[in-house]
Amino acid sequence: MDLINIALDGPAAAGKSTIARQVASKLSMIYVDTGAMYRAITYKYLQNDKPEDFKTLVNQTTLELTYDKSKGQRILLDNQDVTDFLRENDVTQNVSYVASKEPVRTFAVEKQKDLAAKKGIVMDGRDIGTVVLPDAELKVFMIASVEERAERRQKENEQRGIPSTLSQLKKEIEERDHYDMNRDISPLKKADDAVTVDTTGKTIEEVTEEIMTLVNNI
């Protein structure tokens, strides 16, 4: 099969990253977690006491993706590996705001396009099929119920030792959905030629196979 690019979009906790990793592994492709890029910039934003000059912030930022056989994708922010800090609560609560800023978006999208230029990429995010990879050979828009997404996020938090309640997480997810879908720059929306995959009630294996079937039908 010729080298292709696959775009996976969808709201928070729809399972994008998990499925993207599985699909990339099965196809021996490179997985790019674009959300981690925005989280890294958000981490720097928080470490710098929330500056509002985002253009200066990104101009003074270096961001590099590396791949570790045992740990997967790692994010180097200003030459420091910050991957293990990117799922902290304060980062999660601020990433939508930071990612909505035009200088941040431009900075990240340029890097994402460069990574995908040679094909063979599985990339997940919110605007991959619409903005970053509008010519991707396969575009998938993943959805799931708010209830299930909150349960998934709670399990992730438990694994990291982060206390949270389902009601709190449901509220946060609903608020983030609204923010992501209504922001001025690169709002979350399904590309016209994307295939919708509902992951509610499905196992990782079931969703992966569903997308592999789509790949095989290209």
Curated annotation (Swiss-Prot):
Pfam families: Cytidylate_kin (PF02224). GO terms for molecular function: ATP binding; CMP kinase activity; dCMP kinase activity. One of its GO terms (biological process) is pyrimidine nucleotide metabolic process. It is found in: Cytoplasm. Its EC number is 2.7.4.25. InterPro entries: Cytidylate_kin, Cytidylate_kinase_dom, P-loop_NTPase. Transmembrane segments: none annotated. Gene3D superfamilies: P-loop containing nucleotide triphosphate hydrolases. CDD domains: CMPK. It catalyses: CMP + ATP = CDP + ADP; dCMP + ATP = dCDP + ADP. The keyword ATP-binding applies. Keywords: ATP-binding, Cytoplasm, Kinase, Nucleotide-binding, Transferase. GO terms for cellular component: cytosol. ATP binds at G10, P11, A12, A13, A14, G15, K16, S17, T18. Belongs to the cytidylate kinase family. Type 1 subfamily. PANTHER family: CYTIDYLATE KINASE (PTHR21299:SF2), CYTIDYLATE KINASE/PANTOATE-BETA-ALANINE LIGASE (PTHR21299). This is Cytidylate kinase. It comes from Staphylococcus haemolyticus (strain JCSC1435). The lineage of its organism: Bacteria, Bacillati, Bacillota, Bacilli, Bacillales.
